[in-house]
Amino acid sequence: METMLSATAITKLRDGKLMLATTYNGLFIERDGEWKQILNGFQKRIRDLHSEDNVVYGVGDEGIFIRSMNGGENWTVQRFPTKATSWNVCSNVQGTVIAHGDKTLYHSNDFGSTWETIHPFLEYGGGAPSIRSLFLYKHYLFIGTKIHAKYGGVWLFNLETRKLKRIKIVMNQMISALTVHNSYIVAASGSCKGISGNISFCKIDESIESEKTYWHTCQSEQKASSYLALSVDQHVLYTTSTQNKAGISTVCRVLLEEGLVTVCDSVKGHGWRIVNQKEGYVVAGSGESKVMQWKKKII
């Protein structure tokens, strides 16, 4: 185990290298067991990093978007036309990239060189929900909202037909993360009030094809206000939480087959992001970042 700087995002590259977005000191990459700073000088925090082969995308505060086509050697830094924080960026190997503003999507088909703005909730006008999380699956985009008393929950947006449908109704919690695991779509949710954060899941084919979607909620070994991040690798699924009153958050294994969320570690501050390599993982936390059982020796 090793702890490092306060951080907001983490990703792993194709060759197993780790890239960390720190809270105050820019981006670092782990090379040959050492962490080296590769990008700094911008004031905005990066809230998510996503890599596809050797291409890395990052998004964050006030619409910042960063991109490297060569594993972090060179970077393009630009801004989306929004003052909102972009919490998620997703992509595929064909060059599709999607990020978000408050109620808008930014969609690219050329690795982020050019962009189209999409308003998925246009018909809801000023009452539209704000976006908190995204997950791309084939040509379907799963959208998780911030807390919204009327339109909160998980939505499914078809990028080909541009049709939108709501697949999970959640009024009093944000959907902070979405992922796909063993043919299920998995949602992490919660709010800053109470201890009702949960992990829920449904069959992905059912969510796309059926009129009614049945969600199952996992039992949590230890209560949390909210779960914040999800990471899956080789059928191993992890989640992280917000910090408790003592300033400590949890790292948990999610066992969908048993319907359980089991605690396996703790981190100082909020567990903003996690990336795993089977059972090994790295957490980007607001108080510290933590490395557990990663195959490369990290100094």
Residue locations for each model-derived region?
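Blade-level signature of beta-propeller repeat domains, shared across WD40, Kelch, NHL, RCC1
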Residues: 269-299
